[in-house]
Amino acid sequence: MSEFKSYDVVIIGSGPAGSLCGIECRKKGLSVLCIEKDEFPRFHIGESLTGNAGQIIRDLGLAEEMDAAGFPDKPGVNVIGSLSKNEFFIPILAPTWQVKRSDFDNMLKRKALEHGVEYQQGLVKDVIKHDGKVVGAIYKADDMEHQVRSKVLVDASGQNTFLSRKGIAGKREIEFFSQQIASFAHYKGVERDLPPFSTNTTILYSKQYHWSWIIPISPDTDSLGIVIPKDLYYKECKNPDDAIEWGMENISPEIRRRFQNAERIGDSQSMADFSYRIEPFVGDGWLCIGDAHRFLDPIFSYGVSFAMKEGIRAADAIKQAIDGNDWKTPFYAYRDWSNGGQQIAADLIRYFWIYPIFFGYQMQNPDLRDEVIRLLGGCCFDCEGWKAPTIFRNAIEEYDRKQMVG
């Protein structure tokens, strides 16, 4: 095993969460190493950005680079219910984009390098502990094992949930939305709406947990996803191709119409049990950000936005912890902030799936419309005193009580 280096912060994973955490830590004068197992660019879903994510990108000074990369503007989200009924439109209040994640994530990685984040391609194998505190990691690179020491180890490994698998963070627990499988692929030649709505996200649903996304990720390429319950997938489908075909036939005729002359690019893929949470996700010398501790139903595209926001907020907690030699107060504050925002988003999504028609009505309610639009734009962590989250929570609690009685 080689000699080890020491850093203030070691980050596992260089997706949006890891890159933003690294950038913000470097701005605060901390030394940062990011260890990434995959060679970039690499494929990833999560291609539609909220308005909140768009603002973070502008704050990074990347707006011109986003436009130069050909990422389409995202005017809004069109939600279409069964048989094209129950349709409503969600405008985007802050400019943002649809993205090809391989290029977008690579852009964030380059920005992190510009800020002085050091990178190492390698596979993290284990953590190093001393007197119960996490003090580093062991990783494999170039067929050798290496040690690196850290004041804080950050798990930004996404759905690999590294620290959970190693027994450092809590166990991965299923969420309400977990019993689904998403199948997805990219296509050229998809029929789009007329400008200025041609680059909207389109969500089509037939009934609870049966839905599809269509996301324009470049001037000539669209992402199609079909999401169905796991038991239906295993009953009707042998592979992701079958699931996509099933969705075209059964979720909405609009999918077939738009894709009748389209050509698929590359293979289709699938992902199961994608909704989970992990508790605890902070501890002595470590914390988790983004998908490494929680992932919700992706219907409203919160994933990248929440990952970036948590990366930024975690950097604040890390700086406070190191400066004050306090490994509890700042990390617990980050935990509580994260849980609060994530729960508001989870309530909103559950409310939509339980009361989809009434959710559309709430979009037209003058007392709630602005709040709902802002929540859908990613402002779930900054909504103290708003009416909408309380309405959603009360309705869900009443629904759950009736389910227990009935």
Swiss-Prot record:
Protein name: 1H-pyrrole-2-carbonyl-[peptidyl-carrier protein] brominase
Knockout-associated phenotype: Deletion of the gene abolishes the production of several bromopyrroles.
EC number from the UniProt entry: 1.14.19.57
Pfam families from the UniProt entry: FAD_binding_3
Organism whose genome encodes this protein: Pseudoalteromonas luteoviolacea (strain 2ta16)
Family, per entry: Belongs to the flavin-dependent halogenase family.
Signal sequence, renumbered to the chain: none
Residues at which FAD binds: 17, 36, 42, 44-45, 48, 101, 124, 291, 304
Functional summary from the UniProt entry: Brominase involved in the biosynthesis of polybrominated aromatic organic compounds. Catalyzes three successive rounds of bromination of pyrrolyl-S-Bmp1 to produce mono-, di- and tribromopyrrolyl-S-Bmp1.
Gene3D superfamilies noted in UniProt: FAD/NAD(P)-binding domain
One Gene Ontology MF term: FAD binding
Cited InterPro entries: FAD-bd, FAD/NAD-bd_sf, Flavin-dep_Halogenase_NPB
Lineage, broadest ranks: Bacteria, Pseudomonadati, Pseudomonadota, Gammaproteobacteria, Alteromonadales
Catalytic activity as recorded in UniProt: (1H-pyrrole-2-carbonyl)-[peptidyl-carrier protein] + 3 bromide + 3 FADH2 + 3 O2 = (3,4,5-tribromo-1H-pyrrole-2-carbonyl)-[peptidyl-carrier protein] + 3 FAD + 6 H2O; (1H-pyrrole-2-carbonyl)-[peptidyl-carrier protein] + bromide + FADH2 + O2 = (5-bromo-1H-pyrrole-2-carbonyl)-[peptidyl-carrier protein] + FAD + 2 H2O; (5-bromo-1H-pyrrole-2-carbonyl)-[peptidyl-carrier protein] + bromide + FADH2 + O2 = (4,5-dibromo-1H-pyrrole-2-carbonyl)-[peptidyl-carrier protein] + FAD + 2 H2O; (4,5-dibromo-1H-pyrrole-2-carbonyl)-[peptidyl-carrier protein] + bromide + FADH2 + O2 = (3,4,5-tribromo-1H-pyrrole-2-carbonyl)-[peptidyl-carrier protein] + FAD + 2 H2O
